[in-house]
């Protein structure tokens, strides 16, 4: 061996290095990284002042660090020339010295090398195919090529002056820390799935691809990143990317994330809906942040953070996706109508807009099945029960292949069941509702949608009638050719309306101008009436066979609104009955609205949440109801800019314990994609007794016919003192006095519509609602 004299003495050591080897403890015998302080820590075992080959080859762990544990080591190494003689060393620690170069290529057994906190500008580790751990942080290296280090698992090279770092194809590499250098690029090509930890912060890196890896920690702060994608980081726990140029950041797939700091970027959108509440979250100093997508459970906390950052115009919701963040399971429910009452099969009818409840033993959620007959719930782990809730449950029998489900974990599992709804007896029941598709403006066209549905068990055929005041409204067209068209009226014959089926007809009328005769002006009321009847049979629920709509004429309007179709004032006799609401929305922006969400927080003290039904919508809608929050999701609606419109028609019962002068209100927030929500009007309806003392009702009063054309007959078992006529707004229109038990009221001067008659007799009063045709 070169440099070996008699007795195999090694002679090529740097003098300072030899001094350390001979006079100080440098040997670690128990593999704790610290030189032993007793005689076993001395390499010169025979104490002859020399290092023999046998002594060098006996060493497995060599500790030369300044803080090696020896109380006497005060000498700082400037060279380790001769280090190649330690051919069996697997662990070398020479940190915190003044080495400017280090060549350990002749130490083939080396597995761990710690040479941080020196002044290295050169490091040769070529050929070290057993090296697993390398730390040369806090040096002056400008480049490093790790090619060939095929077993390397950990590389620490932070706080150098690196402009080039080659780590490609290190298939065993698990952790890389190269922060605080001068890198402009970092190529991770060829690293494998074992790569878990990366710290490359405080560089000038402009692009970084970590998509192939499932990291547990990622620190890339203080770089020049404008894009960073994290589609596969399901085990990422710590993530810091502050002080970059990121405009959007999506950690939706990071379902184990505990720490996220993305402060001081150029973010306009942030997606943190991942099913977990981060322990530490920061996104300050992103003044252009307009949208944050979060889990519902995090909504309040993230909103508070945004407020503290001064982000008053930042929309925060969960509507970047319509499945839960993180892990979840899915229950699919198919609903079919057994028209022949012989068991559901492939020939039976898939139903839509059937209310479905999900119960986990404590809480209940609701959805309505879609057009293909399917409904779905997203769940965590646990036991769940799914139940169809029909408007008329006594009409039908319901059976299911299964309605209870168990999931051991929220891990992407799914289960499917089928519900079969069959007739329970013979029931004839249809309904009609009129929906304004536009406002009524003087001189412009107005569109009205007639929505009719078979709620019974039998196929229905019959007639749908539509009437209006032809003095102020002119018929223009209808989406379905009428069977009869007369002045102020149109009718359509319908056949084979299936149970649960809904159909619509749109009718267009033109409103008189302010200069026409008679004139129509802002604030006028237009009265329109729709009625439906089944041929040859009696409808079991005639109250919903007629719908009167009183529309106020306007000159201007808000296209995003909620309207109660029954009006702003109703008699107390309507308490506990259905109210119909239409929510209109319009895309007034400059780009397509891909998704639209209507969020309605319903007052449970005023409304019966269990009665809510979806009747009709302008496009396919996914409904979910949790507690008193109803969300109507129009996914992929692609609503065109500059006037693309949509709507949903609902009905819900008011609580039966409401009294005179109580009000019910509805409003909604409308979310167009990632924009700040638009808040609609607060639509308020007041229940009023129209001055009647309900403790003094005269139940003998009878009013007929109803509906009425011109004259209405009124009778009672007591003398009728007066009859007062009120319109739907509660205004007194007409008074008739008398003293007999029978009287005739002439309504020929009143327009078509709904009126209230307050009839006062010797024994009390009564209010009756009538419809004038």
Describe every region a protein language model picked out.
Residues 320-332, 347, 422-442, 557-561, ...:
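Residue-level detector of functionally pivotal "anchor" positions at catalytic/ligand-binding pockets or at interdomain
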Residues 494-522, 633-661:
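Low-complexity, intrinsically disordered segments enriched in Ser/Thr together with acidic residues
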Residues 404-423, 515-574, 586, 616, ...:
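Extracellular/luminal low-complexity Ser/Thr/Pro-rich, glycosylation-prone repeat/linker regions
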Residues 339-350, 357-378:
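Short, acidic Ser/Thr/Gly-rich low-complexity loop/linker segments typical of extracellular
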Residues 5-91, 271-276, 287-329:
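N-terminal capping/linker segments that flank leucine-rich repeat
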Residues 135, 177, 199, 240, ...:
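C-terminal outer-membrane/trafficking sorting elements
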Residues 434-459, 572-601, 669:
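Short beta-strand elements of extracellular/lumenal beta-sandwich folds
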Residues 281-283, 373, 381-395:
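A short, solvent-exposed beta-strand micro-motif common in secreted/extracellular proteins
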């Amino acid at each position: 061996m070169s440099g070996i004299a008699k007795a195999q003495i090694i002679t090529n050591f740097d003098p300072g290095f030899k001094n350390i080897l001979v006079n100080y403890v440098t040997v670690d015998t128990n593999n704790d990284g610290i030189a032993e302080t007793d005689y076993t820590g001395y390499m010169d075992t025979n104490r002859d002042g020399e290092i023999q080959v046998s002594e060098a080859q006996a060493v497995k762990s060599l500790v030369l660090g300044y803080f090696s544990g020896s109380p006497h080591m005060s000498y700082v190494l400037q060279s380790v020339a001769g280090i190649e003689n330690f051919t069996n060393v697997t662990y070398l620690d020479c940190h915190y010295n003044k080495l400017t170069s280090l060549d350990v290529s002749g130490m083939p057994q080396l597995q761990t090398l710690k040479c941080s906190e020196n002044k290295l500008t050169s490091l040769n580790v070529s050929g070290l195919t057993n090296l697993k751990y390398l730390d040369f942080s806090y040096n002056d290296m400008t480049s490093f090529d790790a090619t060939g280090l095929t077993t390397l698992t950990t590389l620490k090279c932070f706080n150098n002056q690196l402009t080039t770092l080659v780590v490609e194809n290190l298939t065993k590499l698990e952790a890389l820390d190269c922060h605080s250098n001068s890198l402009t690029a970092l190529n991770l090509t060829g690293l494998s799935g074992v790569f878990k930890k990366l710290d490359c912060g405080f560089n000038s890196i402009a692009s970084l691809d970590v998509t192939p890896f499932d990291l547990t920690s990622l620190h890339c702060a203080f770089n020049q990143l404008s894009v960073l994608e994290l589609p596969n980081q399901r085990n990422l726990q710590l993530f810091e990317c502050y002080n970059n140029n990121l405009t959007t950041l999506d950690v939706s797939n990071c379902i184990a994330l505990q720490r996220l700091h993305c402060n001081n970027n150029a973010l306009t959108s942030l997606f943190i809906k991942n099913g977990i509440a981060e322990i530490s979250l920061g996104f300050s100093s992103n003044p252009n942040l307009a949208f944050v997508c979060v889990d519902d459970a995090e909504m309040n906390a993230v909103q508070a953070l945004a407020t503290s950052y001064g982000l008053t115009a930042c929309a925060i919701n969960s509507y970047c996706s319509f499945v839960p963040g993180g892990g979840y399971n899915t229950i699919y429910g198919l609903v079919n109508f057994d028209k022949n009452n012989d068991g559901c099969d492939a020939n039976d009818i898939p139903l839509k807009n059937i209310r479905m409840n999900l119960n986990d033993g404590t809480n209940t959620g609701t959805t309505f099945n879609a057009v293909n007959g399917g409904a779905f719930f997203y769940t965590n782990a646990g036991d769940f029960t799914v139940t169809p809730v029909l408007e008329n449950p006594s009409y039908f029998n319901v059976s299911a292949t299964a309605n209870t489900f168990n999931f051991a974990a929220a891990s992407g599992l799914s289960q499917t069941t089928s519900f079969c709804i069959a007739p329970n007896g013979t029931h004839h029941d249809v309904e009609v509702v009129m929906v304004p598709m536009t406002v009524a403006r003087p001189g412009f066209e107005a569109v009205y949608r007639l929505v009719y549905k078979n709620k019974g068990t039998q196929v229905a055929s019959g007639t749908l009638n539509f009437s209006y005041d032809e003095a102020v409204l002119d018929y223009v067209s209808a989406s379905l050719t009428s069977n009869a068209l007369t002045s102020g009226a149109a009718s359509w014959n319908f056949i084979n309306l299936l149970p649960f089926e809904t159909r619509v007809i749109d009718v267009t009328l033109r409103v008189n101008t302010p200069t026409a005769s008679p004139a129509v002006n802002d604030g006028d009321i237009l009265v329109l009436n729709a009625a439906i009847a089944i041929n040859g049979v009696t409808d079991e629920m005639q109250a919903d066979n007629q719908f009167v709509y009183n529309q106020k004429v306007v000159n201007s309007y808000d296209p995003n609104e909620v309207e109660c179709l029954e009006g702003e004032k109703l008699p107390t006799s309507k308490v506990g009955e259905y109210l119909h609401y239409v929510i209109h929305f319009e895309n007034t922006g400059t780009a397509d609205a891909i998704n639209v969400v209507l969020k309605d927080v319903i007052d449970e003290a005023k409304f019966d949440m269990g009665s809510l039904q979806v009747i009709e919508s302008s496009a396919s809608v996914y409904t979910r109801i949790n507690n008193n929050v109803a969300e109507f999701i129009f996914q992929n609606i692609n609503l065109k800019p500059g006037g693309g419109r949509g709507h949903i028609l609902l009905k819900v019962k008011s609580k039966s314990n409401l009294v005179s002068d109580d009000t019910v209100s509805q409003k909604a927030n409308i979310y167009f994609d990632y924009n700040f929500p638009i808040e609609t009007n607060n639509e308020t309806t007041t229940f009023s007794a129209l001055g009647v003392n309900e403790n003094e009702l005269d139940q003998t009063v009878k009013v007929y016919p109803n509906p009425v054309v011109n004259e209405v007959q009124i009778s009672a078992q007591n003398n009728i003192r007066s009859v007062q006529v009120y319109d739907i707004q509660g205004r007194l229109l007409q008074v008739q006095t008398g003293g007999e038990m029978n009287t005739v009221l002439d309504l020929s001067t009143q327009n078509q519509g709904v009126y209230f008659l307050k009839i006062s007799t010797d024994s009390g009063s009564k209010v009756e609602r009538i419809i004038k045709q």
